[in-house]
Amino acid sequence: KGIQSLNPRWGIPTNTIPYLGYNEAITLAMYGGASVIHPFSIEPLISSGIPMEIRCIFAPHTPETTTYIGPDIITQDSNLKAIGCKPGISVIKCHAPINSKILSMLEQIDITMWSIQTKGNFAYIVLSSSHMESIFPHVDSVDVNHFTALISFVGTIPSLSEFDEDGNWHEFSRSKNGGLFAVNTDNLEYLLRKLSANLELSC
């Protein structure tokens, strides 16, 4: 069925995305929205403008079962295309610039960072909460906050005011391709269902 607006692993039926720009697809692949593609499979296509087609080989080849990936196209009519979700994240807050010892330590113990952001005098490293037990013996003088999930919005970022009662949101970054938010919520599946329905991504 191509790439869905929400990863099918959540069991929430959503629409097939007809078109994704290269950078939108990379964002979705990196942050839990599309397990059928990998960022490294898209990056070589960008310089030459080669398109990619994602479709189910067991279904008829129709617009409803196919996602095309190509050059980024941003228009006034651009809208939210997809939601990515990585459950169970931790955010390490440290003084900027980031201490090289921290980055070296993460590399040595083979931990993947999902995002690094700098705001003012501080830097924020986002990674899986499952790695924290390995990290704590190697770091000190840092603040660590835990969140239910990292949510990525691909396309136009929606207003989250109507979802304030369902979760405590923390913005990490935003760009023309979307944004990254950490959220604490008592019911992640319910929040994803509500986001999908209210933002018109559900089937």
Segments and roles (model prediction):
Residues 1-203:
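C-terminal catalytic "cap/lid" subdomain
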